[in-house]
Amino acid sequence: MSIECHNAFILHRRPYRETSQLLDLFCQDVGKVSLIFKGGRSGTRMRRGTAQPFTLLQATYFGRGQLKTVKSLEAKTQVVPLVGNRLYMAMYVNELLYRLLQAETACDGLFNTYQDTLISIARDECPQTALRNFELTLLETLGYGVNFEQDIYSGELLECGFEYQYQQQAGFFAKQAIHNKQHIYTGEQIQALSERDFSNPEVLLAAKRFCRQALAHLLGGKPLHSRALFSGAK
């Protein structure tokens, strides 16, 4: 029996039968893994309390199919303290990973970014900056990184002082007649996106708009539950 052990975070959990849970973990070395946690709902208090989101775990599991079996879960850190809107932001990050990651596809750099993002959401004065950085890293990891330097049609360099139109899954091109201004970005905003410089509030808003547009196609037009929770809490 092959046993694996990885650092991991819980992305999603749900009840299974009378005493167990189904878990989706984000593991440092192997990406997203689905497991059954037997007795996870009715075991000892220590066992039940271990399976908490936003806690770095050491996950040991076994199995050959798509659904593995938890052997043990051990908390390596305390739960990242998240309350109010910051909790909804962290739930949003988890939902993106749960929805978009392919099963058992390694993405070490993204794991580190995810861990840093949780800490930034909890502690930073402006957690929106961490969210935008995470979204851009996620797009790159999934193979949908955008060229922020060249016009996708002419090949010319994008310049400050001009406006450009964004085309999903492609990139930017010189602005044409368009009714939806939400897809228009200035050269200055695009350059700041490329450098991940969100110090300008207008750039931070533009980054939020861009990331939402870039992720929309990957999500298949299906709404995010965490986004609805966040909107309802305002």
Predicted regions and their residues:
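Non-catalytic alpha-helical scaffolds and adjoining flexible linkers that form interface surfaces
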Residues: 1-21, 26-234
